[in-house]
Amino acid sequence: MDPLVSIIVPVYNVKPYLNRCVDSLLGQSYQNIELLLVDDGSTDGSEALCDEYAAQDVRVRVLHKKNGGLSDARNAGVDAAKGEYLSFVDGDDWVSPYYIENLYRALEQAGADFSASCFEEVFEGQPVQSVPTERLEAFEILSREECLRRILYQEGMEVTTPTKLYKRALFEGVRYPVGKLYEDIPVAYEVTKRAHKAAHIANRDYYYFQRGSSIQNMAFNPRKLDSVRHCYALMENVKRDFPQLSRAAECRYLSNVCNILFQIRDKQHEKIEKALWQEVKKYRRNVLLDPQARKKARLAAALSYSGYAMTRRVYEKTQWRGKK
């Protein structure tokens, strides 16, 4: 019998999307699953909908808890999970029928510690593009170092917690930082560092739903600096543990700083704006001279020598359009 996979779904006020998410998980071709719906203090009826699913399907368990945020909900799910493997799906996303099967087969055949699939981004209010769903045909086997290199250079391997299947052992002693945004970043590093190898599949089995109210689409506020802090810590950890990837870590850090910097639109955050610009100036030379760096990062580094105003003007006009 296939081993038990625990699928952890944090739920907070996502009632309009929850049926789509849960139905896609209960319809998996891989049958030996437990679905942990972690109700993080919902008030829109999501909590009752979770209970309805638990009453209808023995594979569903519901954890009701006080609101503590995404990290706290994920941690509660990890603590309660009974499976040998863990997977995470956000409550407004959904997956293909072969999502877990493809991830598990790749992991098993590769002898990997975790596997990752690609995703299809879906924007609120826009039609969903049809993506063929199929069983696994091929996958890549990545060493720990190559996996980390791709994360840092953003070459198809994401830091996001969803889209992956993990051996439970990777989470022994690892939990998400409570009260912080962009909590995926530090955990992605810790589990990758513990893994001997990973399997990466090209199937786009995960549908990542972008709502207008999502963190990524929110206007700048100082809490978004959590992303910069996480990426700085990531860079320092990589330089300590994998010095051969130092340039890659600097590239990731500069990309992150630019992403947050150019979200700032008003004068009340001028001090933050100036501090982030100093970070760009500090790392731009190394990124510019790194032939493996993303084109976006090298473009930002090169433009920065023309001054902040020009760099920002080009960014706002193009969003580095067409560059990778």
Regions found by a protein language model. Name each.
Residues 55, 70, 160, 248, ...:
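General helical secondary-structure elements
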Residues 171, 238-239, 303:
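Hydrophobic alpha-helix position signal
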Residues 204-212, 218-245, 259, 263-286:
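Catalytic core of nucleotide-sugar-dependent glycosyltransferases
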